[in-house]
């Protein structure tokens, strides 16, 4: 899990530069790893493995892999380039052929294209925030971000 790798690297760097607090850093790292394991277990147990979705842009591979969800496509790979007619036709085909449950927009982008596709296909829509734009910064931001994304997938 990338979060654990990042935390371990941070702890190592802190210990190298502040050996006086090594015990504290190691204890905090151990607790953070346990908290991440609990979060992973909780989210995995809450998400429906048969739920199929399409997201606005291709930014969820780690979430998808970690929690075993099915993201069948994205409207765009690059948020600077909106999907064209061919891409929209492919998305409609996936929605109809694979019985997609939900398509997701993101708060920082105009949802009109998502709404138009949903109207044509009668698929549910939701909003997912991979940046945590609506969340409060702080020590629990990562946990809140993952929890918020999980709620979005569950709630659609």
Can you name each region flagged by the protein language model?
Residues 1-156:
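Extracytoplasmic metal-acquisition and chelation regions
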């Amino acid at each position: 899990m990338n979060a654990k790798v990042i935390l371990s690297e941070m702890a190592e760097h802190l210990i190298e530069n502040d050996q006086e607090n090594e015990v504290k850093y190691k204890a905090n790292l151990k607790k953070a790893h346990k908290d991440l394991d609990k979060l992973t277990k909780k989210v995995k147990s809450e998400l429906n493995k048969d739920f199929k979705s399409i997201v606005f842009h291709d930014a969820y591979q780690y979430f998808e892999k970690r929690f075993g969800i099915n993201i069948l496509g994205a409207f765009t790979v690059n948020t600077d380039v909106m999907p064209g007619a061919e891409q929209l036709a492919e998305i409609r085909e996936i929605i109809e052929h694979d019985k997609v449950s939900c398509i997701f927009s993101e708060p920082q982008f105009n949802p009109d294209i998502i709404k138009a596709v949903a109207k044509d296909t009668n698929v549910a829509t939701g909003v997912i925030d991979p940046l945590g734009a609506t969340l409060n910064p702080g020590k629990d931001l990562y946990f809140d971000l993952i929890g918020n994304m999980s709620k979005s997938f569950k709630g659609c």
